[in-house]
């Protein structure tokens, strides 16, 4: 969600509260000195992260020298490691980099250092931060791409009292919406990445996380029957023009974030659809640009705020549903995150990684908005509204967590995007598209 600047008194109260909690170093364990820390965050996110680190600095006496490296932090960090000048600690945005650094012996084994704190995370998150059975990282920030956003007023117009919990219910609700004169979906396409995110959710929910990871590694081919199932399942929704605002042809030019505006327009305009899919960052588009939407009252899966047309309009989301036959995959989540690793093992680095593994810093950023933590010890009360709370609870409760395939597929991600746009143009041409994708995966991944 959109980072929000809170009054100084509120931020001060948060910092004072955090200073007294358990994972901030006490005066008797002050380390002093300094620790260098790299991450990708800048601007508002950097300000929020700095606020989150403030209790650590005040309690430990250690100065954190933070440096923003932007979205190319992986490249910058690799060069620094190769040149023998890495930072003490870094937050990196994918598990692949952690695996590479651990294999090279460039980051510290945290298994014993975090022996009392690793239980703050579910097994799915600890597995993603491990290499050869040893823990090498701490997931400080998560992102949830398991979210379908809906306009409660449009659901109410079709007498739909609660969002769907299964894929079958989603298809049924689409029919119910159409019968009431409401178009079900605004399908974001842009240059292809939102369609890829959508398809990957369908694959995860139908095939499961193990198969998903095998497809990512290309140990499962793109011609596998599980891929076909995902395509045919997705076609149940996007293969019918009347399900989409603008139809299939119009959806091909549905750029982000304009696709969100079709469900959550500015005051004075009417919605063109009831639902839109994309990650948790959609909330920024719903509440920004002088819009006046308020978060729903119960977060994921529940009833929403009032649908009285004279009242303030609201928004909500539900978790991307699995088919009822694949209900075991319901809590599997596709997304992203930032994992902290130690490149120089010093007392200051160890103190900082312990702090990042605890709930205090994450709770501060959570209260500021635009943040979700997979840490089980971050209290639900830290989140400013029911929607952000629901997003975070889904991360914490994930049975498995996978990263977007197009973030892990080497140089052929843009080919993948185009392939999925080609599928949208002709949903019956699955076998040809699968064969093309498998050839591209072989060329892009080298196997």
Model-derived regions, located:
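Extracytoplasmic/periplasmic substrate-recognition and gating elements
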Residues: 281, 290-371
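Short, solvent-exposed loop/beta-turn-alpha elements that line the ligand-binding surface or hinge
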Residues: 111-123, 206-230, 301-310, 322-331, ...
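Long, aromatic- and glycine/proline-rich binding clefts that accommodate carbohydrate-like moieties
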Residues: 318, 366-418
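Extracytoplasmic/periplasmic solute-binding protein
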Residues: 136-140, 146, 171-220, 229, ...
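Conserved N-terminal structural module of periplasmic/extracytoplasmic solute-binding proteins
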Residues: 4-8, 12, 19-99, 364, ...
């Amino acid at each position: 969600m959109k980072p929000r600047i809170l009054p100084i008194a509120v931020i001060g109260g948060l910092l004072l509260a955090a200073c007294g909690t358990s994972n901030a170093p006490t005066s008797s364990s002050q380390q002093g000195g300094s620790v260098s820390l790299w991450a990708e965050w800048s601007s508002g996110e950097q300000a929020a992260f700095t606020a989150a680190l403030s209790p650590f600095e005040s309690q430990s006496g250690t100065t954190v020298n933070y440096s923003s490296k932007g979205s190319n932090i992986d490249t910058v960090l690799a060069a620094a490691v190769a040149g023998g000048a890495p930072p003490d600690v870094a937050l990196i945005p994918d598990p692949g980099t952690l695996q590479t650094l651990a294999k090279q012996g460039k980051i510290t084994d945290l298994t014993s250092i975090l022996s009392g704190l690793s239980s703050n995370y579910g097994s799915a998150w600890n597995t993603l931060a491990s290499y050869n059975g040893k823990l090498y990282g701490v997931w400080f920030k998560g992102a949830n791409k398991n979210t379908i956003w809906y306009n409660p007023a449009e659901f109410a117009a079709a007498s739909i009292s609660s969002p769907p919990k299964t894929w079958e219910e989603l298809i049924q609700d689409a029919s119910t919406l159409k019968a009431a004169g409401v178009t079900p979906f605004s399908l974001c396409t842009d240059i292809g990445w939102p369609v890829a995110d959508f398809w990957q959710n369908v694959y995860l929910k139908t095939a499961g996380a193990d198969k998903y990871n095998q497809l990512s590694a290309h140990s499962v081919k793109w011609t596998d029957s599980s891929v076909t199932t995902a395509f045919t399942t997705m076609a149940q929704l996007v293969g019918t023009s009347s399900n989409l605002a603008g139809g299939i042809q119009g959806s091909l030019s549905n750029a982000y974030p304009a696709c969100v505006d079709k469900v959550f327009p500015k005051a004075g305009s009417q919605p063109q659809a009831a639902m839109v899919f994309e990650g948790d960052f959609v909330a920024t588009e719903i509440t920004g640009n002088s819009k006046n939407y308020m978060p729903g009252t119960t977060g994921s899966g529940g009833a929403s705020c009032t649908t009285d047309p004279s009242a303030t309009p609201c928004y909500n989301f539900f978790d991307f549903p699995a088919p009822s036959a694949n209900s075991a995959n319901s809590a599997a989540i596709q997304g992203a995150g930032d994992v902290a690793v130690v490149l120089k093992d010093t007392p200051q680095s160890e103190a900082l990684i312990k702090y990042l593994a605890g709930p205090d810093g994450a709770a501060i950023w959570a209260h500021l908005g635009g943040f979700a933590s997979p840490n089980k010890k971050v209290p639900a009360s830290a989140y400013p509204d029911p929607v952000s709370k629901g997003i975070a609870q889904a991360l914490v409760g994930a049975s498995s967590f996978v990263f977007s395939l197009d973030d892990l597929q080497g140089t052929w991600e843009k080919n993948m995007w185009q392939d999925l746009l080609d599928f949208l143009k002709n949903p019956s041409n699955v076998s040809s598209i699968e064969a093309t994708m498998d050839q591209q995966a072989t060329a892009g991944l080298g196997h």
